Amino acid sequence: MDEPKHITILNTFTVENIPDLDVAVLGALELFSKEPVPTIDLKTVYKKPLIVGSGNAEATGRIIFQDVDAIFASESNFEEKLKHIYAIDGVVVVSASGGKHAPIIVKTAKKYGKHVTLITNSTYSSASKELDHAHSYDEYVFPKNREPYTYNTSTYMGMILGSTGEDPGIIYNFIKEHIATISFPDFLQYNKFYLIIPSKFSGIIRMLHVKFIELFGRQIARDIETFEYVKHATTVVPSDELFISFGDTNDSWGKPENRLHIPLPPDAGYAAMMAIGYFTIAQIQKQHPPYFKERIVAYTKEVSGIFEHDILPIVE
């Protein structure tokens, strides 16, 4: 692996020179190549946990606990699950910041008599203050990099690595050797993209959708489906869009000139899929107008009022 130059960029940028998403990806892989991540093991703690998160935290929870007999929920419906599913014997809250909805979820879970585990990147968070802190499994705190608000790349990637055990150095080298060297098309020709991913990574779909929403809003249209689901009437109405396939080659969808293939490592896990997916989206970000960079400062001021506490455009 190269010297950790991307971490240096992340440690020094300002709102005047916000880096693209690929810097956060490579910086995260640099971080986890030198700092170990906790191993999440709650199989002996809970028999039927409720896994709760907001946005990409919810998606991360689904990935981490995909092989567990668990119930999944967001901030919008978790209390309904607690009310009606009596088999739930504990609540796992996934939250990078441990703020916003997280402390509300913890308080509500305890109101229903459920033990709570917090998976986070922030020590001494508002949610952490609500925990029992009587067991080693009450809180898992993962390392993270300094990043633009909402990028949440090192945060959730670390949690996924703590579950999959993938080697971040191998992922980093694969990106540098096999992805960064691709002659990417002129993405500015397209404002519609269709990402096709291997079926075994269906859990990443929500994370990629959210990243498109955060970076481009409704300025760029996107669909993201698996190789199996794309067969189900998703292209009835044709469009001048770029089809980007990950792993397998797309020989069926879109005009041949509107297809881009992105390779994956042969033994890729969810962390590799996340890193390569985000890195690819960053190439689109580089070529389109800087929608995110121009709006993030104003947005954090607006949303601070909604959550009634300061949310900054740079997460230290």
What are these regions (language model features)?
Residues M1-P36, T150-T153:
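Cofactor-/ligand-binding subdomain signature composed of acidic, glycine-rich
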Residues L10-E16, L21, N152-Y190, F292:
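YjeF_N-associated NAD(P)HX repair module
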Residues S33-I88, F187-H232:
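Anionic-ligand anchoring segments at beta-strand to alpha-helix junctions in alpha/beta enzyme folds, i.e.
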Residues T44-N173, F246-P263:
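Glycine-rich phosphate-binding loops that contact phosphosugars or nucleotide phosphates
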Residues I170-I171, Q219-D223, H288-V297:
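Flexible, glycine/charged-enriched surface loops at secondary-structure junctions
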Residues I175-S183, Y229-S239, I296-V315:
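Short, mixed-charge aromatic SLiMs
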Residues S202-I284:
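Internal helical hairpin/lid segments
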Residues P263-E316:
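Charge-biased C-terminal accessory regions appended to nucleic-acid-, cytoskeletal NTPase
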